[in-house]
Amino acid sequence: MHSNVKKVTDKDVIKPVGVPFVVYFSSISNNTHRFIQKLEIENLRIPYEIEQSISVDRDYVLVTPTYSGGGEYVEGAVPKQVIKFLNNKQNRSFCRGVISSGNTNFGDTFGIAGPIISKKLNVPFLYQFELLGTQHDVSQIKQILFKFWEDGNNERK
């Protein structure tokens, strides 16, 4: 795991309510898109075209790939489209957690977009997976998301 991950305590976490919902970005390779489809969870895709935008008005977990060159090079790790989406105060306010993907060939910067966003937004970094992910990753993430929402719904009753 990454050394710069901020520990988020339970008192810091605002758990989501409603039903599990994922907002994600996928490049033209569609790796993240194909992974999200396997989750079979309601979702919304951040547009690839930087001029386009979306707005979110409900709790969500962000899933993003990592763009990074490995080693100490983390500049540009968070895709520009994700930065633009999160620069919208309303979109940012509904983010409850983050999941990232990456390539283990890049060593310490594998999935580093997740910890960067987690630290910036003070939300939990929930999981990371490699490239297209595995069936195990799909199962783990579904379990994490449903538990996260269940806890949030129970706390607000």
From Swiss-Prot:
Q: Which InterPro entries match?
A: Flavoprotein-like_sf, RNR_Ib_NrdI_bac, RNR_NrdI
GO molecular function list: FMN binding
GO BP of this protein: protein modification process
- Do you know which Gene3D superfamilies this protein is assigned to? 3.40.50.360
| Pfam families according to UniProt | Flavodoxin_NdrI
Query: So what does this one do?
Result: Probably involved in ribonucleotide reductase function.
- Family statement drawn from the similarity comment of this UniProt entry: Belongs to the NrdI family.
The protein here is known as Protein NrdI
Organism annotation: Mycoplasma capricolum subsp. capricolum (strain California kid / ATCC 27343 / NCTC 10154)
